Regions:
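Bacterial Sec-dependent N-terminal signal peptides
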Residues: 1-23
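A long, amphipathic alpha-helix that forms part
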Residues: 39, 209-234, 247-288, 469
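Substrate-binding rim/cap in mid-to-C-terminal beta-strand-loop elements of soluble/periplasmic
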Residues: 319-357, 431-473, 487
Length: 487
């Protein structure tokens, strides 16, 4: 009988051991800022075999992934990818937005100090993001035994993906010419970061963010984090979030078809191939799960489009603000429009209250005036967008992109390919932020651990990325998640 009991206990232990949850050793989230989905194929024949083509040829591609909110900008994209949520819930309503009648930056936090430099570039944290991230949920699932690290040149592209419970987030201080962090995470830089900065710094104020070299610097820092933090070497799954910022900055300056854009994507492909080889060696080819996506897309340059007889143009939002304020000055005796951002107009509550006016009257008068402008397809009260006659898919994106107290009171939808800016025959750049496919259609690739080669054209959304990764890890999805697991 004792032998039988011993045998049964042994079998139970063996079954229990074999039934342990299987997870990769490392999860890598890679965001390429302003990467339109079609860049996967526009440059395909020029890519090498070890970078983007390797992801396409060995991984799984969700070919029809769209952003399901507007405005489509960097901070919102990064927060939505990792929270599986939208601005209406996360509170990240733009890169910049107005709060209490003041313009604020999404990650600015005067309560923390810069670590690694004497500038204010490190006074940043995720405190304005109201939802958890993949990394936060991974930490909770492992009782905070996992390591989560964020790396990017842009602060918001490192801070928001890494989340609230990250072990570290590092970004580039242009004035110092090296990577920094904030006291939100730590009181001093780890020795490996100090050593990296000594070997990989630039001259102070050199704008590496707008060069292909910035891509290389980001991947070098990410590789250093893998090696020195020993990511993927512990008992629990670790996470590394990486964002490539120069693709966005170069795109803004030179648009989607310039030689500069070509150069940065060739550099991206080369550096990605080396990064994947490093992961193969350091973590193991089948031990890491990587996903690649983008924070948003971009419109083609309007001069380029016009050369081919395709309607396009620029909306001079500064002129609209001035014109609207002039109109409201004549009607009410005040000029309450503080400015435009994210295709929204922001009103100054203090100015309206001091004049003894009802805010709704000012909003209604503003909308009536703006509707006369043929540049706009729709002008609406953000609080009442559900009552506006417009296609449901646009309405849904407007609703998802609105956060009371941080978004503007008045929203506008311009004609397709008409983005915010000034008209100039010399203008070579581009913008993003609209609800149309050129801004919303982004890549979403899975690669590595437990991923079979394939593709899908089923409509998928940016908010589906986080629940997909969490489902693969068998952990809870982020607490504000509205997406669906797709793999």
């Amino acid at each position: 009988m004792k032998k039988l009991i011993t045998l049964m206990v042994g079998l139970l232990i063996a079954v229990s051991s074999n039934a342990q949850i299987q997870r990769p050793k490392l999860v890598v989230g890679l965001v390429v800022d302003q990467m339109r989905w079609d860049y996967l194929y526009y440059y395909y024949n020029e890519y090498g075999t070890g970078g983007l083509r390797r992801l396409l040829n060995e991984g799984f591609s969700f070919e029809n992934t769209h952003i399901n909110y507007a405005p489509t900008v960097t901070a919102i994209g990064h927060s939505s990818i990792y929270t599986g949520s939208v601005p209406a819930i996360t509170g990240i309503a733009g890169n910049y937005f107005y709060q209490d009648d003041k313009s604020v930056y999404c990650c600015a936090d005067p309560s923390v100090k810069s670590v690694g430099s004497d500038s204010k570039e490190g006074q940043m944290s995720p405190h304005r993001m109201l939802a958890s991230t993949i990394g936060d949920e991974l930490q909770i699932a492992t009782d905070f035994r996992s390591k989560v690290i964020g790396v990017a040149l842009k602060d918001r592209a490192s801070i928001l993906p890494a989340g609230h419970a990250a072990d570290g987030a590092y970004w580039w201080d242009t004035s110092a010419g090296h990577f920094v962090t904030s006291s939100f995470y730590m009181n001093s830089l780890p020795k490996w970061v100090e050593d990296f900065n000594k070997e990989n710094h630039t001259a102070p104020n050199f704008d590496i963010k707008s060069t292909p070299e910035g891509v290389t610097m980001t991947f070098k820092m990410a590789a250093a984090a893998v090696r020195n933090e020993r990511l993927g070497k512990g008992k629990e799954t670790d996470m590394l979030t990486v964002s490539i910022s120069p693709t966005d900055i170069i795109g803004h300056k030179f648009s989607t078809r310039g030689k500069e854009n070509h150069a940065v994507y060739m550099q991206l492909d080369k550096d990605l191939a080396e990064f994947l080889n490093m992961l193969d060696k350091e973590v193991g080819r089948d031990n890491y799960l990587l996903f690649l996506t983008a924070a948003h897309g971009a419109a083609h340059n309007y001069n380029y489009m016009r050369e081919h007889r395709i309607p396009a143009g620029a909306w001079n939002y500064k002129e609209t603000v001035k014109s609207l304020n002039d109109h409201l000055q004549q009607k009410f005796g005040i000029a309450p429009v503080m400015g435009e951002d994210n295709y929204q107009l922001f009103l100054n509550d203090s100015t309206i209250n001091a004049a003894g006016l009802k805010k709704q009257d000012v909003i209604d008068a503003s909308i009536d005036y703006l509707k006369q402008d043929p540049q706009f397809l729709y002008v609406f009260d953000e609080e009442k967008v559900t009552n506006v006659t417009m296609p449901e898919w646009i309405k849904e994106r407007m609703e998802n992109g609105y956060f009371r107290g941080r978004s503007g009171e008045i929203g506008v939808v311009t004609r397709p390919q008409f983005f915010g800016g000034s008209e100039s025959p010399q203008f070579r750049g581009t913008q993003h932020g609209q609800p149309f496919p050129y801004d919303t259609h982004i890549p979403f690739l899975l690669f590595g651990w437990n991923v079979k080669h394939g593709s899908s054209n089923v409509e998928t959304h940016i908010v589906d990325i986080a629940p997909t990764i969490c489902a693969m890890l068998h952990i809870q999805m982020p607490n504000g998640c509205v997406g669906t697991a797709r793999y």
